Amino acid sequence: MPINAIRTCFRWLEYEYSRHALDQSIVRAISDEEIQEAIECGEIIEDYPADKYGPSCLILGLTREQRPLHIQCTYPQLNTVKVITLYQPDPERWIDFRKRRLQ
């Protein structure tokens, strides 16, 4: 259910970026279109119920070009999702981009 609610917000363009996420999308050359593609096929891989922005999650999704993206966003609040941060996961730090490697 939560991923479907997040997808619905993205389909209806009911989302916004934190300043950090906007900066990171520019620095890491991640387009809005790629973010939408990743959310559409994505899965929640981590849950952050006590995050400072409110309950949020980490989504792993692939773009049309098969680029893996991690997108941390809030669960819908007042029909809006806030993207907190986003990045292309480092395979040295993630197993199959889904599970954190032990350091």
Predicted segments with their positions:
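Ribonuclease/tRNase effector modules and their secretory precursors
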Residues: 1-103
